[in-house]
Amino acid sequence: MAAVTGWDRVEVKKRLSEEHWDPWMAWMNAYFPLSSSDRKDWDSKTWVRNLHELRLRDLLLFTLGDLRGKKVLDVGCGGGIYLGIVSKMGAAHIAGQDLSQKDIALARNRFQREGVPADIKLGNATELQFETESFDVVFSADFFEHVTLEQKRKIVSEVYRVLKPGGLFAIKTPNLSYLKFTTALRRVAAAAKLKSPLNIHVPHTRDNPDSEHCGLTTHAELEKLLFDRMFHDPEVIYPPLRWKGAAGFAARFLKGRKRFAEQIILTTRKPLFYGFYPGHD
């Protein structure tokens, strides 16, 4: 597609929000057609942050492996942006479940418009509306931070149920340990500038009426949930840190330590021997 020049920022945003089913799709379709000179006019921090998030999303999808011929479920699928990529990765069957009627409608309309068969269900993830042992791969991205610990237990049990023995389960969610660490650094920096550190807190956890991130978790808590449900020991993937300067130099030595991973990205598998045993539940 040729680069777009001489654009009006407000008009582009309005047009894209009307044409595209998901704000992230609108953002990507706004970014990539623009000329390099136009991109420079936009807030560089916003672009760096958003492109970094796309890299993290890629990293999760890379962990799913070869999806050709496989049945894949997205738990907490939202508008289906991940499933759209999964379908392009060759999955034989894609499915998703979410509690938001608006997001489910967006996903269904999108896949219908693109002619992609998709089994999209409306419902709570604590009760997945799919047959036992029906999926090769299940993943959940940017969802676990929105549910309580007790809900996570039920969701993990349901994922275990719908996965085939040996099936893969992948999770991506913000790392509470990292958020606490960086919040502490921001408070110290604020105090050094004679500003109140009390106004700085972990995002989406304070003064937020909908408690958007009520379920932020750590590697240890999440790994224990999986272990308690007899999943295999998780494989942890450490995403790259986007710090610059002295912090970026230090990040080279911090990579591989769970506390300093911005996101929790891990995979685990339903066991084979125990999974095939008829009395495992």
Predicted segments — roles?
Residues 6-7, 15-35, 148-162, 168-281:
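S-adenosyl-L-methionine-dependent methyltransferase catalytic module, highlighting the catalytic core
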Residues 67, 93, 114, 150, ...:
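Secondary-structure boundary/capping positions in well-ordered alpha/beta enzyme cores
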Residues 142-146:
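Short catalytic micro-motifs in class I SAM-dependent methyltransferases
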